[in-house]
């Protein structure tokens, strides 16, 4: 199993030339929260062309600063500051629905355990809008009319250092219908070792044990 995991890691780390590694597609698992409901409606600017959570206005807009989510804090919990300890409103990792109750907001977290990743690109289509954070740091927000289309919103996440990273998303809708499309890729991605993989120090001890066992067998044979 250990050798198999190493082979998989190498294949993901050094893909065939010109081929990106696909990390997430629309149906892939993430943590999901659909308990926000309409608690954010008309906050952060109201039903205006520059409002973050309108009820009717379908204007195209972008948001350089993060929204105030205090009216949904009970639903979201510490999702931006402590994603390792989500409250009971969050699902376990499961396939993310590509639509939700119209006129409400939902939140998603994708977790990446990696030994390093390069040129991570995230492409989204959302009806109507979205807000994104990486490890709790706000990246961008935007809204556009019409249905979801691939590449509607594109995020250049750059390189990820070794460790666990969280891409936190809030999807906005203000009625009618909605939809969600995602495709996240990297030029290279080395998965973080699963819990069953021994630490390097343990491997050294294991190797020393095998060497000692071999010497004992040689002495007995002599």
Where are these regions (language model features)?
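Sec-dependent N-terminal signal peptides
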Residues: 5-14, 207-209
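Sec/Tat signal peptide C-region and signal peptidase I cleavage site
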Residues: 16-20
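Accessory carbohydrate-binding/adhesion or oligomerization-edge regions at the termini
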Residues: 21-91, 95, 111, 166-195
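Extracellular beta-rich ligand/substrate-recognition surface
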Residues: 94-106, 142-148
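Short beta-strands within extracellular/lumenal beta-sheet-rich domains
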Residues: 100-113, 153
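Aromatic-lined ligand-binding clefts that engage carbohydrates, nucleic acids, or primary amines
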Residues: 114, 118-131, 167
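Beta-strand-rich ligand-recognition modules
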Residues: 131-185
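A short, hydrophobic C-terminal helix/tail in secreted or cell-surface proteins
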Residues: 196-216
């Amino acid at each position: 199993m250990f050798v198999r995991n190493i082979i998989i890691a190498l294949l993901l780390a050094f893909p065939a030339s010109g081929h990106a590694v696909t990390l997430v597609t629309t149906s892939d698992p993430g943590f999901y929260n659909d308990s926000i409901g309409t608690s954010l409606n008309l906050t952060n600017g109201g039903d205006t062309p520059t409002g973050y959570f309108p009820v009717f206005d379908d204007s195209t807009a972008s948001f350089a600063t993060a929204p105030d989510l205090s009216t949904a804090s009970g639903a979201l919990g510490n999702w931006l500051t402590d994603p390792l300890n989500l409250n009971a409103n969050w699902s376990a990792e499961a396939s993310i629905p590509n639509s939700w109750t119209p006129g409400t907001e939902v939140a998603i977290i994708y977790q990446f355990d990696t030994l390093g990743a390069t040129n991570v690109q995230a492409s989204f289509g959302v009806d109507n809008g979205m807000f994104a954070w990486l490890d709790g740091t706000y990246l961008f927000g935007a809204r556009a009319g019409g249905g979801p289309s691939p590449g509607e919103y594109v995020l250049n996440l750059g390189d990820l250092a070794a460790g666990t990273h969280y891409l936190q998303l809030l999807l906005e809708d203000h009625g009618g219908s909605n939809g969600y499309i995602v495709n996240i890729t990297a030029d290279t991605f080395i998965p973080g070792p699963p819990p069953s993989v021994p630490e390097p120090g343990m491997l050294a001890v294991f190797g020393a044990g095998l060497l000692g066992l071999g010497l004992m067998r040689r002495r007995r044979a002599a």
